Amino acid sequence: MSSTAAKKDVKSSAVPVTAVVEKKEFEEEEFEEFPVQEWAERAEGEEDDVNVWEDNWDDETHESEFSKQLKEELRKSGHQVA
């Protein structure tokens, strides 16, 4: 095999440079950058007991319209409802 034939094989199997650059640009655009969030430092003695949701689950009405309809349908179909 001559040296020009070997060069042709190398050139034909090489990935075009533009394809590599385009791929890199796509990968960089794939992820969205988010700004850094600054959190306030806690003061000494600040309580760790922070309530982030309501603890009064028992205060909710257990006899909502939905639960009444569900119990009625269960009774109609022969199920025992407490």
UniProtKB/Swiss-Prot annotation:
Subcellular location(s) of the protein: Nucleus; Cytoplasm
One Pfam family recorded for the sequence: DSS1_SEM1
Effect of deleting the gene: Embryonic lethality, growth defects, larval arrest, reduced lifespan, and sterility.
Tissues of expression: Expressed in intestinal epithelium and head neurons.
Record-level GO cellular component terms: cytoplasm; nucleus; proteasome complex; proteasome regulatory particle, lid subcomplex
Residue span of region Disordered: 56-82
Coiled coil: none
GO biological-process terms attached to the record: double-strand break repair via homologous recombination; embryo development ending in birth or egg hatching; epithelium development; intestinal absorption; mRNA export from nucleus; nematode larval development; oogenesis; positive regulation of growth
Start-end of Basic and acidic residues biased regions: 63-76
Chief localisation class: nucleus
Signal peptide as annotated in the record: none
Stored CDD domains: DSS1_Sem1
SMART domains hit by this protein: DSS1_SEM1
Known role: Subunit of the 26S proteasome which plays a role in ubiquitin-dependent proteolysis. Has an essential role in oogenesis and larval growth. Required for intestinal function and default lifespan.
Assembly notes: Part of the 26S proteasome.
Family recorded in the similarity comment: Belongs to the DSS1/SEM1 family.
Name of the protein in question: Probable 26S proteasome complex subunit dss-1
UniProt source species: Caenorhabditis elegans
